[in-house]
């Protein structure tokens, strides 16, 4: 088989990278330069100037390091998006110029998928749940039905952006992450908001609260410790939810924030608690680099061939789930459930039990070793208490939930009716999707948010839907919260092929609209608004 050599150019934000890789996965060269702003964050124009200066210098450097000539190149690959518009344009222009001058084929690739694929190359992971976290991106990604799917993402700013912003505002400098990590080792916990909405996280409120603590005079070490622990606990929890939903047996960490040893430790502990393998590429491959662009270019060229030069424009908001990825090996290796459990969710063990001679299940919110005790105890107690209340409150709408037998706040557990039926993800069809929409509308009409509506948290018993697991539930009349609730369900449908999943969600919205009432259109519009937000443009 002929071995091809690809040169990749990266420049979505502040890091310029050029890498050379062959189709056997050998890294032949890796060169890069990072922009360090004198003050403030990364300005798109300054980033573009940085790339314009360094790309012409790094290309010959990489060629020399690889010990090859320009004629030996078989393909030019570049990061097509997502990223800063001016920066992406410099990268694309440089790649086109090089490809045309050498008469070589060209291909543009998705930056986020580049991180995942180079991570798999380096670690040997086959089909992991990946936490990709950087200055501009925070996503939980896993491959399902021919594409990389985003199971969780930020609803506002990225985790790395949160840390960098805090660093700038408090005079710690940019990037903020390394300084925050150092100061956090000397700090103690102060209470900060913990915001997980279904499979998504939000960092803007956490950032604002942390800055307020600094202005109040709280020791900077304490704020750094609390900011880091809270932000990373949110990231790991959502990754854990995706792992529980997909039942994959590999967890991978990548992106610039993976330089933080505490985040690596937390994710590794979580993976081990589920019996999953933890993977992380070597540090030089975690941040933005040209190697990942070259490697993904080779993969996509092998699958689809090169791009026509007219199709090499940038895609500033290039979503991970827009790319067909049929090359991924969806192996049959999954998590193995311990013998004593009926199920193991993201935050609870489900144990077979009984109550007055009736079949029952005990939902036990077990301590999470990756979280500090202050955060862990607070979350487990508040969620247990609220879930018990919501299980009862939601019945007023006519929605079926398990009968509640006992609540033990000290041990953070709930004893409830055992539901004999089938998980919805095993039996969903058009008609059931419509019924789901009707039932969700009933719940929302009471201003109750389920918080984690997935096909794993609904069952079909005797032809009727039963809603489970209100652990992330709360009361809210906000259209945004109701829209996010529906989007959680949409993401959980991603294990089905795109066309069918889209059809099912349309049926859900049809049932929802017919049942909800006068504000249904505002909620459905809010769904579109949330989906259109620029979460990948730094």
UniProtKB/Swiss-Prot annotation:
Cofactor dependency: Fe(2+)
Compartment(s): Cytoplasm
Main location: cytoplasm
Gene Ontology cellular-component annotations: cytoplasm; EKC/KEOPS complex
Binding site for ATP: 342-350, 363
Reaction(s) catalysed by this chain's protein: L-seryl-[protein] + ATP = O-phospho-L-seryl-[protein] + ADP + H(+); L-threonyl-[protein] + ATP = O-phospho-L-threonyl-[protein] + ADP + H(+); L-threonylcarbamoyladenylate + adenosine(37) in tRNA = N(6)-L-threonylcarbamoyladenosine(37) in tRNA + AMP + H(+)
Uppermost EC category: transferase
Protein name: Probable bifunctional tRNA threonylcarbamoyladenosine biosynthesis protein
Naturally occurring in which organism (per UniProt): Methanobrevibacter smithii (strain ATCC 35061 / DSM 861 / OCM 144 / PS)
